[in-house]
Structure formats: C-alpha cells, structure tokens
Design a protein with these regions (language model features):
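Conserved active-site/ligand-binding neighborhood in enzyme cores
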Residues: 1-359
C-alpha cells in the first residue's frame, strides 16, 4: 500500500555534508573543518533510515542500549532488511519498506505539493515559463543550443526554490539559516583540547513539511510519532496517511511511489519544447554527457552505514568510504534524457527519477 509520510521539523536541524567537524571515534574523511555546513534538504538515504526507525518502533524492536538477542536480530532483519543502504550494492532488501518516491514538500494547511523549481523556469514568483532555446549550432563538442537573448540573464542566474503544483507559485524563502558558534572538546593525539566550531542549522517554514510517498506492508508504520535526523539528532514529527487521502493523489494510480509523483508532475508541466527534469537526485555514470543544452548542479554524498550487531554508538555508525557524485534535483536537460547509471536499489528509494516536460 502507498502512504504519504510527512516530516515536520520540531527544531532547527543540521543535515551533514562532507564539510563538517568529526565526532570522537568516527572515521575521518579528509574534509573536516571548524565549520559544519548543512544541507537544506534530507537525503533519500536519510529518509529511508527514518522510515526504518519508524518500522522498528511500530514492531517494538527499538532498544536504547542497542542490545538484541539473536531472535530479535532476526526479527529486525525481516522488518527493515539485513544491512544499511549502499550505493555499490544494486540488489538490496529493506524489509517491510518496498519503495520510496523522491523527496518533495507539502503545505499541510493548503494540502498542496511542492517540487524543486525546474532550473529552466523563467517565472520568478508565479507560473511555469520554460526557457526558449535558439537553433542548433555545430561546434567542436557537437551540436549545442543556447537560450534566446532575453531568456537568460546572468545577473539573475537560473531558477531556484520550490514550485507549488496547481497554483504554480514559486517559493524561494521557505528556509532560514542559523549559525551556532562555540567551543567543543576534541581528541588530538590522545589529549582533549578545546576547538572552535561553527555549525549551520536550518529552520523550515512552520506551514511546510518534508514528504515522501512510501510503499510498505500494510500498517507497518506508526501514524504519528517523533523521529530524529541529522547532526545532533534534531526532532521531527512524522505523520502517515494513505496517499489517496491527500487531495493531490486522490484517484491516482501508478506502479510505484516514484511513478505516482512523476505522473503528477508531468501532467502539470507538460508544455512547450522537450525538456527532461530531474525530479530526484541522479546517479551519473563515468563520462556522463550533458547533451545540447542543460542546467545542472552537482553534489557529493557519503551516506552513513550502521552495523546491526554493534552495541557501542560510536562503532555502530560510520561514513561510507566512497564519495558518490550526483546530479541535484531540479536540473534540466534539453532535447533528450541523459543516460544514467542503473541501480535498482537506489531507484527503489527515489533516485534516478526524470520527468519528460513538453515535446
């Protein structure tokens, strides 16, 4: 069954990046800094982790001391899968959690859906106005197309924020950034020392929540609970309801949560020339080619991996030794869809979702 799961921040949060200070006992990445930068949005891997936490909570399998009998460990494996998500393992099982859609936002009061604003949208406050391109031009790299003279202004840059489906209003100020400054104790060559730090935190507008569509076993998740995500384990209120109970998804059917959200977006924005829009982050293969014209943001990710049998907190979690390079949601490609790296497990949790807009 497909459910709508929303996560409302109860306090400012920090969603970690490679630019962060380390914590005692953790593997170093070479990117540690006195500044802990934060992303505005949670990763798909983090949302999967939150849903697994909720499934364990519903099943009565959360122990604060992480101590489980062999029988309980078998129940945990059946409930949420045998191991942490890994990009390098395309065949994985997540127990009662079958599939996720890409992240989006909802306005809980208006009951509307918001998606990352396509980067080629020229409307700054309201509307969807795809950028118009000129005739093809031959060059050393092949055939390219450029925006018409008035279609792109370098001083303004390309589109950002979130686009509300239905009204097509653009929201660019849903997040507020806060900085925490202070000193913390760190271990340097077996000695404790004081170290200066600054940590970024974000607050999401109170009328909005992070959201995913999740296909799970029936009644596998609690309908209303608190989960913890990010650095310092910020609290989020998680609420679950059948997807069909939310107005945008009423009467809609699809083979997967990603297909359900994708169909909604394509029906709303299918106008003009052929553009391909990254509704989710994309996994780009080596030698990835961008085509005749595109507007793309890149990002890197090291997800957190957990060892089920480890009882000590510092040894239970580690950063992935592999840094993955992704194309950020909101990126757009003209003319033809990009070739992506196939990864069944990543696609099942909401990666590699591209919408065909127009054409």
């Amino acid at each position: 069954m497909t459910y709508l799961v929303t996560f409302s921040p109860l306090e400012p949060y920090t969603f970690g990046t490679d630019q962060s200070f380390t914590y005692e006992g953790a593997d170093k990445t070479g990117q540690e800094s006195y500044l802990a930068a934060s992303n505005q949005l949670p990763e798909q891997t983090m949302l999967l982790g939150a849903l697994r936490y909720m499934a364990l909570q519903k099943a009565g399998l959360l122990h604060t001391d992480f101590s489980y009998t062999p029988a309980e460990q078998e129940r945990i494996r059946a409930c949420i899968g045998p191991e942490s998500f890994r990009f390098q393992k395309p065949d994985q099982s997540f127990g009662v959690i079958h599939a996720l859609s890409p992240l989006f936002l909802v306005n809980r009061e208006k009951q509307t859906v918001l998606i990352p604003n396509p980067f080629h949208n020229r409307a700054s406050k309201s509307g969807y106005q795809p950028m118009q391109l000129g005739a093809p031009i031959r060059c050393g790299e092949g055939e390219i197309r450029l925006p018409l003279a008035e279609e792109y202004k370098a001083k303004k840059g390309y589109a950002s924020g979130f686009l509300e489906l239905g009204s097509r209003d653009v929201y660019s100020e849903l997040f507020q950034k806060h900085l925490i400054t202070g000193n913390q104790e760190v271990m340097e060559e077996d000695e404790r020392e004081q170290a200066f730090f600054r940590r970024e935190r974000y607050a999401l507008d109170k009328d909005y929540a992070f959201a995913v569509l999740a296909e799970t076993a029936a009644d596998a998740l609690p309908t209303d609970c608190v989960v913890y995500m990010g650095v310092k384990r910020a609290a989020f209120r998680a609420r679950v309801c059948p997807a069909e109970a939310f107005p945008a998804f009423q009467g809609q059917a699809a083979e997967s949560p990603s297909a359900l959200l994708k169909g909604l977006v394509e029906a709303e924005l299918n106008t003009g020339d052929a553009w391909y829009y990254a509704l989710s982050d994309l996994i780009a293969p080596p030698g990835f080619r961008l085509g005749s014209f595109s507007i793309v943001e890149e990002k890197s990710l090291r997800n957190i991996e957990t060892k089920l049998g480890e009882t000590r907190l510092l040894h239970r979690r580690r950063r992935s030794p592999i840094r993955w390079h992704l194309i950020r949601a909101g990126s757009v490609f003209s003319g033809q869809a990009p070739m992506l790296e196939k990864n069944a497990a990543a696609e099942s949790i909401g990666y590699n979702v591209i919408c065909n807009l127009g054409g």
